[in-house]
From Swiss-Prot:
GO BP term, example: gluconeogenesis
InterPro entries per record: His_Pase_superF_clade-1, His_PPase_superfam, PG/BPGM_mutase_AS, Phosphogly_mut1
Xref: Pfam families: His_Phos_1
PROSITE patterns (UniProt xref): PG_MUTASE
Source species of the chain: Geobacter sp. (strain M21)
Family: Belongs to the phosphoglycerate mutase family. BPG-dependent PGAM subfamily.
Gene designation: gpmA
Catalysed conversion reaction: (2R)-2-phosphoglycerate = (2R)-3-phosphoglycerate
Lineage of producing organism: Bacteria, Pseudomonadati, Thermodesulfobacteriota, Desulfuromonadia, Geobacterales
EC identifiers of the protein: 5.4.2.11
The protein's assembly and partners: Homodimer.
Alphabetical keyword list: Gluconeogenesis, Glycolysis, Isomerase
Disulfide bonds: none
Pathway(s) it belongs to: Carbohydrate degradation; glycolysis; pyruvate from D-glyceraldehyde 3-phosphate: step 3/5
Name listed for the protein in its UniProt record: 2,3-bisphosphoglycerate-dependent phosphoglycerate mutase
Length: 234
């Protein structure tokens, strides 16, 4: 059996303020830090140990991982930061209040941008300073890889090369893996692992700071998955 744990980062300050976040690099809120500590303690209490960890290039996920590993006394294990695990890019919506955006564009349009599998929000202009091309952490990436906006389908397609090239080889080596990432990048992994339909994946809710445990067979197919605190199937 292979062990994989997925963890959405703790609440961020923009989660708390109901703002579109995407690739904006915001901090964890105090509640998010506490969620991360509780997740680490929960994993430790249940006897989980990891051989390596993956996270995104965004500090709300990075700090979640660090807090969890500190609680587990596992800060020494290898960790890799992968841009493909970043949150979905919300384009020109990033930084806007979700309720105010709905008032401006209408509930149905905003619902399409947020929850449709294939509809992208308005894109950032290339000259917009929020565009990832201005961020030094992405300077090594070719321009065509950097999104100015994404739908969920784009995010899924971005995440899958990480799964195949990074996670699968590590799991096949017998490594126990923790992935601390974001709601939509984790949706991409869950969609692939559980063969969730395009229609159903958009409605899948992933709570912040709650470890989702996968037990995988020799072919890396899920035998069982559950949220740790309740044992409830995901």
């Amino acid at each position: 059996m292979h062990q994989l744990v997925l963890l959405r980062h703790g609440e961020s300050v923009w989660n708390k303020e109901n703002l579109f976040t995407g690739w904006t690099d915001v901090e964890l809120s105090p509640s998010g830090e506490e969620e991360s500590r509780k997740a680490g303690l929960l994993l430790k209490e249940h006897g989980f140990v990891f051989d390596m960890a993956f996270t995104s290039l965004l500090k709300r996920a990075i700090k979640t991982l660090w807090i969890v590993l500190e609680q587990m006394d596992l800060m020494w294990i290898p960790e890799r930061k992968e841009w493909r695990l970043n949150e979905r890019h919300y384009g020109a919506l990033q930084g806007l209040n979700k309720a105010q955006t709905a008032e401006q564009y209408g509930d149905e349009q905003v619902k399409l941008w947020r929850r449709s599998y294939k509809v992208r929000p308005p894109a950032l202009a290339e000259g917009d300073r929020r565009h990832p091309s201005f961020d030094p952490r992405y300077h090594s990436l070719q321009g065509e890889l950097l999104p100015s906006t994404e739908c969920l389908q784009d995010t899924v397609e971005r995440v899958l090369p990480f799964w195949r090239q990074q996670a699968v080889p590590a799991l096949r080596q017998g490594k126990r893996i923790l992935i601390a990432a974001h709601g939509n990048s984790l949706r991409g992994l869950i969609k692939y692992l559980d063969q969730v339909s395009d229609e159903d994946i958009v409605g899948l809710e992933i709570p912040t700071g709650s470890p989702l445990v996968y037990e995988l067979d020799s072919d890396l197919k899920p035998m069982r998955h559950y949220y740790l605190e309740t044992g409830k199937t995901g």
